[in-house]
């Protein structure tokens, strides 16, 4: 059942932010099984239009919602794929190949199968099952899950617990549950000096010594020691640019870009204050000006499993189903869980992450079966 759904989902060339028919396929499938569905298209322009779906079966609490995305990253050169078509279902040696099989059409297929079988086998269950699916997670994530959550809550829908189907597992299905994510903030620093000839440095003010001093301190700063569920926060310099191709000219300015992935001990504003304090110190010493810009796609968040019965139940289901004790993790990049956490508690749990976004992306059929079993048994446990 899940392989059938995955075969159909892979066939849609849903490169972000395009649904390419994938969400419409899910909508039609769920309608056939008596789900109440609504598709909403959000976006500032035609190029940015994003397709979103909310579908629900039942009207009672708790409402267990699967949150996912059909959009995928570009497939690259088709010639490097086994069957020269990453959007055609290809099964070989117990594996299913195709763009999005891991991230995250495989998880969508498994939760679809688990939900429909659960409803078929448990006609008198109490509660609701819902799906929130977008075509804008791999891109800007501006008009997808974030806007759709606000819309459905304006319509008075309430989600009690969400399963986000990101590929979280590392070596085997069940070994990792994501219960939070690090925050991310990007900085762009521009040091403004005074251009001049290298033979007359006293008539110029080179911005580079100041920038070098600042970056040296930033890369050596110890932001924290980490927490029970988070690794230590980390700063990485990603670009240095002086826009100067001549060797006899002192540049007028020098710029650097850097990113901080941070845990729950910080937020964007406290980090900005710390960074700016260091910058001001050196700019004063070197008598240069500066401009600091920053942007953040996510604050950090954490849900302590010790304080959340539904997260505990999810972990217990994995242990009973797969005979493996899951590790609670906050590693990796950002995901749509950063939007969901403002509305309800959640876990992120899906397939193995190793092949996500890679040429010849694949998942094992046996892993799909394991994921299906976990999803199905969790619905039994919670509803």
Swiss-Prot record:
Cofactor(s) this protein requires: Zn(2+); Co(2+)
EC class: hydrolase
GO molecular function, one term: cobalt ion binding
Active site: 71, 137 (proton acceptor)
Pathway: Amino-acid biosynthesis; L-lysine biosynthesis via DAP pathway; LL-2,6-diaminopimelate from (S)-tetrahydrodipicolinate (succinylase route): step 3/3
EC numbers on record: 3.5.1.18
Keyword Flavoprotein on entry: no
Keyword annotations of the record: Amino-acid biosynthesis, Cobalt, Diaminopimelate biosynthesis, Hydrolase, Lysine biosynthesis, Metal-binding, Zinc
Catalytically driven reaction(s): N-succinyl-(2S,6S)-2,6-diaminopimelate + H2O = (2S,6S)-2,6-diaminopimelate + succinate
Binding residue positions for Zn(2+) 2: 103, 138, 357
Zinc as UniProt keyword: yes
Cofactor comment: Binds 2 Zn(2+) or Co(2+) ions per subunit.
Annotated CDD domains: M20_DapE_proteobac
BP-aspect Gene Ontology terms: diaminopimelate biosynthetic process; L-arginine biosynthetic process; lysine biosynthetic process via diaminopimelate
Binding residues for Zn(2+) 1: 69, 103, 166
Family: Belongs to the peptidase M20A family. DapE subfamily.
Assembly and interaction partners: Homodimer.
Task performed by this protein: Catalyzes the hydrolysis of N-succinyl-L,L-diaminopimelic acid (SDAP), forming succinate and LL-2,6-diaminopimelate (DAP), an intermediate involved in the bacterial biosynthesis of lysine and meso-diaminopimelic acid, an essential component of bacterial cell walls.
Protein name per UniProt: Succinyl-diaminopimelate desuccinylase
Organism for this UniProt entry: Rickettsia prowazekii (strain Madrid E)
Gene that specifies this protein: dapE
